[in-house]
Amino acid sequence: MHRFRLVAAACALLMAQAAFAQQKEWIEYKNLDDHFALNTPGQPTVEKTMWVSEYDSKFPETVYRWTDGPNRYSVSVVDYSDSEALYTANHHTDDFSAPAYWQIDILGSIQWAASQLYRLKPGVKVTFDNFHYINLVTGQQLTVINPDMTRSYVAIYLHENRLYILDATVTRNAPAPIAFQQSLEFLDAEGKSVRYRTYYFDKLPEPKLGRRGAGQGTQGPLPDPGAPANGGQGGRGAGAPR
């Protein structure tokens, strides 16, 4: 019995050492290309891909990923700067051909991402879903329980026409990953942290193709870009042709 206890203790020590070895040193990670900084477990792996927007435009997306033991962290950055050109190049039905829709694609990007990646994902239970801001940049924050009982802490922001999706997925009993989620900073062209004196809402890019669409920034309400023929209100709805 005594020998068994010694073996069990040795195994427990080895497991603890292995778990400790898996933990990574956290650093302040800065990315000048996508203009953000935050605390992360080391350097990321980087994947270039494409993001499909609500109105079927395809935007360049960069996904930065980290792991720390069983926990997974990511920042996805989608650049909506060319929304006008990309939307105009697509073939849309008459219901969705109004120039304002490329702007609506940007303005609705936070809610679109939240719904497509989390709210509508099969087997996911949303336990928190509300307006949020960090450094006065407005966005949305969600907490979800995944089918494998891990928990994802999500924050989504839109800054300078870039969509930022932060996801920290941790084991069932792990503490909330505050060090990752609450350390986000937005950087200017010189790599300095951006600070605002009041709430920041994204400013739309200047139209370049001769049709001004819905106006600039978020300084006033969007005009009706043309209601769909079926009388629907707002957005395109599930399954609606574009």
Please state what every model-predicted region is:
Residues 39, 43, 68-72, 137, ...:
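Short, solvent-exposed coil/turn segments at beta-strand boundaries
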Residues 8-16:
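Bacterial N-terminal signal peptides
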Residues 1-8:
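Bacterial N-terminal signal peptides that target proteins for export
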Residues 22-60, 123-125, 133-136, 195-202:
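N-terminal "mature-domain start" segment
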Residues 50-151, 225, 236, 242:
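Conserved polar/disulfide-associated segments of primarily extracytoplasmic proteins
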Residues 208-242:
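Disordered, low-complexity segments in secreted/periplasmic proteins that are enriched in proline
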Residues 32, 44, 98, 103, ...:
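Surface-exposed amphipathic alpha-helical segments
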Residues 15-23:
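Sec/Tat signal peptide C-region and signal peptidase I cleavage site
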